[in-house]
A protein has these predicted regions:
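Auxiliary tRNA-acceptor-end handling modules of aminoacyl-tRNA synthetases
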Residues: 1-168, 172-183
């Protein structure tokens, strides 16, 4: 497909394969929750990880002391971008959930990209112009006009035992603020 999303995915796959060839990234060690303004010996590893994933702009050169272990505002913004992209609460804190997402190996990320590219092949060739897209995993819905997002909102989806069905359909009408009674 020639859809821009698919092409971005292919580019990202190429980048991640190059990262894998170069050795990927090492896991960041566990420890207490890192918060902005703190100094922590894990910060250089965090900087490297967020730079290779392009959440943090800059080079892979090590900062000079005392900034090498300081969790500064630029790093906080990068962490929030990473958290947002991975469906985590973008609070800037490196707790267990964020650390787990950061430590997913590059090979697993490549597998995720490949699966999503395959899904895209089935869906994106039919998406153009105006459409609504529900991101079940991200708990949000977006309205696109001329292939650009113009509105996004949080959405409630199913549960593991009552999964939201995946489908595509033409929308004939929308009901805002429907009546709802407790079952």
């Amino acid at each position: 497909p020639q859809h821009p999303w698919y092409q971005r995915g292919r580019k990202r796959l190429k980048e991640y394969r190059a990262l894998e060839t170069a050795g990927g990234w090492s896991p960041i060690s566990t420890g207490p929750t890192m918060k902005p303004g703190m100094s922590d010996p894990r910060v250089p590893a965090l900087r490297y990880r967020l730079t290779v994933s392009k959440d943090l702009e800059g080079t892979l050169e090590a900062p000079t002391p005392p900034y090498d272990t300081l969790y500064d505002p630029a790093l906080e913004a990068a962490v929030k971008r990473f958290q947002q992209r991975h469906g985590l609460t973008p609070d800037g804190a490196i707790g267990p959930g964020t650390l787990q997402a950061l430590n997913v190996p590059v090979s697993a990320r490549i597998d995720q990209i490949r699966v999503n590219l395959e899904r895209s092949r089935w869906v994106l060739h039919e998406l153009h112009g105006n459409f609504v897209l529900v991101d079940v995993a991200g708990f949000n819905v977006s309205y696109f006009r001329d292939d650009e997002p113009v509105w996004t909102s949080k959405v409630i989806v199913g549960r593991p035992y009552r999964e939201t069905p995946i489908f595509k359909s033409t929308i004939s009408y929308v009901v805002f603020n429907p009546t709802w009674t407790i079952p």
